[in-house]
Amino acid sequence: MAFTFAAFCYMLTLVLCAALIFFVIWQIIAFDELRTDFKNPIDQSNPTRARERILNIERICNLLRRLVVPEYSIHGLFCLMFMCAGEWVTLGLNIPLLLYHLWRFFHRPADGSEVMYDPVSVMNADILNYCQKESWCKLGFYLLSFFYYLYSMVYALVSF
């Protein structure tokens, strides 16, 4: 049993991947709450509840915005660690999502907003559906990656 830099990378990635899974689960719950808020016709006809709805939507979008940079940074750290460790297959599996994160970050709205998840645009049904599908896809990717990292960590520890 040998402790190598690759084994360390897989251990750290395993812990951080669990954090990313929780981030994405929180995003799915937040988008579901926005969808419920969007479709509730009783609250839309109540003017006293309208201000509360708007504040709730702004609060959720603000929290979603705060998770974007940490998620992208953690995934970028994965790629950097695997590149330094010479784990080319694992790096190759992570590059497509890294490129998507870079594309999504640099193609944010041109109105000068911080990143994305603007309350007005997120309440558009098409954008809300897109964001929710994106979160489900990321959850699948991170879950599969978690088990791949677990297997690779064990393999790296017992292979020498």
UniProtKB/Swiss-Prot annotation:
The Gene Ontology CC terms held by the record are:
dendrite; membrane; synapse
Q: Which domain of life is it from?
A: Eukaryota
Segments passing through the bilayer: 11-31, 73-93, 139-159
**Gene Ontology BP term (one):** synaptic transmission, glutamatergic
Q: Which UniProt keywords apply?
A: Membrane, Transmembrane, Transmembrane helix
Which family is it part of?
Belongs to the cornichon family.
What is the official name of this protein in its record? Protein cornichon homolog 2
Q: Origin organism of this chain?
A: Danio rerio
Q: What is the lineage of its organism?
A: Eukaryota, Metazoa, Chordata, Craniata, Vertebrata
